[in-house]
């Protein structure tokens, strides 16, 4: 196979999954794999041989198709016609990507189908919390569904995740706002005031109320969306830190996102 390197370089890109056939042999007292044939591995052609992308990279433990169906139920509960059309348009237009996309590279839900798991979890949390407050239920639900939508274009969803050019230069909140605005143009008579509120939810959800920062959550729904996101992300991060800690000590080490020893029991 080393005789065909120039041709193979044209055939593959970094991060492609490969299907190989060949045999092993002993060379200089070491076992070597001699590859006779190599192709890009796809489910379409190699699924019958057991190829499954979810077995190659870290993936959600939940079934993506079932999560998608659960999410559609929540979206279809939105009674505001324009808002329902907007959310459905955004999600259905990117369904294929949403089913597999991670929610981040190094933070919470940083695995295959992580984005879908994250937004579904936040929507389920929102449904439970909304009855306790005098807030617009549908605005909160729409908020948790839209605040992370920019990650679909911020990072790549292949076997090796990395930031896209747009992700590096703009960031996912700006990208999410663009996605919102593009979709709103396709919904006839979409309310201007509602769009402005949705934009604010997207731009303010990560703000930690630090001095001299812009776009702080400035109405009750924005504040609730902010805390739903923060609570869910931080708890998942803490769970991951505990699960990944290999020591038998009662506490984890200090070198983690929270910079503190976390009780594991």
Cite the ranges covered by each PLM segment.
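ATP/Mg2+ or Mg2+-diphosphate-binding catalytic cores
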Residues: 244-252
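Short, basic/aromatic beta-hairpin or loop at an interaction surface
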Residues: 1
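Acidic/His-rich, divalent-metal-binding segments that scaffold phosphate/diphosphate chemistry
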Residues: 46-167
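Conserved NTP-handling cores and scaffolds of large molecular machines
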Residues: 22, 42, 78, 94, ...
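N-terminal intrinsically disordered, cationic/polar leader segments
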Residues: 226, 253-256, 263-265
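Divalent metal-dependent catalytic cores for phosphoryl transfer on phosphate-bearing substrates
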Residues: 107-111, 117, 128-245
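OB-fold single-stranded nucleic acid-binding module
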Residues: 4-52
């Amino acid at each position: 196979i080393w005789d065909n390197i120039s041709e193979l370089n044209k055939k593959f890109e970094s991060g492609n999954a490969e299907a190989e056939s060949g045999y092993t042999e002993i060379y200089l007292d070491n076992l070597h794999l001699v590859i006779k044939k190599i192709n890009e591995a796809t489910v379409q052609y190699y699924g019958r041989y057991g190829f499954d992308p979810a077995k190659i990279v870290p993936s959600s433990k939940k079934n993506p198709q079932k999560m998608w169906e659960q999410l559609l139920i929540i979206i279809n509960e939105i009674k505001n016609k324009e808002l329902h059309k907007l959310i459905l348009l955004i999600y259905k237009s990117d369904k294929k990507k949403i089913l597999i996309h991670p929610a981040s590279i190094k933070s919470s839900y940083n695995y295959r189908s992580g984005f879908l798991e994250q937004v579904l979890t936040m929507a389920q949390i929102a449904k439970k919390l909304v009855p306790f407050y005098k807030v617009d239920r549908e605005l909160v639900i729409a908020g948790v569904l839209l605040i992370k939508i920019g990650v679909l274009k911020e990072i790549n969803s292949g076997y090796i995740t990395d930031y896209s050019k747009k992700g590096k230069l703009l960031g996912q909140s700006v990208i999410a706002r663009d996605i919102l605005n593009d979709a709103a143009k396709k919904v006839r008579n979409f309310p201007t005031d509602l769009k402005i509120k949705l934009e604010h939810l997207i731009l303010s959800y990560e703000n930690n109320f630090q001095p001299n920062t812009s776009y702080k959550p400035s109405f009750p729904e924005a504040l609730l969306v902010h805390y739903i996101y923060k609570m869910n992300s931080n708890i998942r991060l803490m769970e991951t830190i505990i699960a990944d800690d290999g020591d038998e000590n009662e506490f984890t080490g200090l070198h983690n996102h929270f910079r503190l020893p976390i009780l594991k029991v």
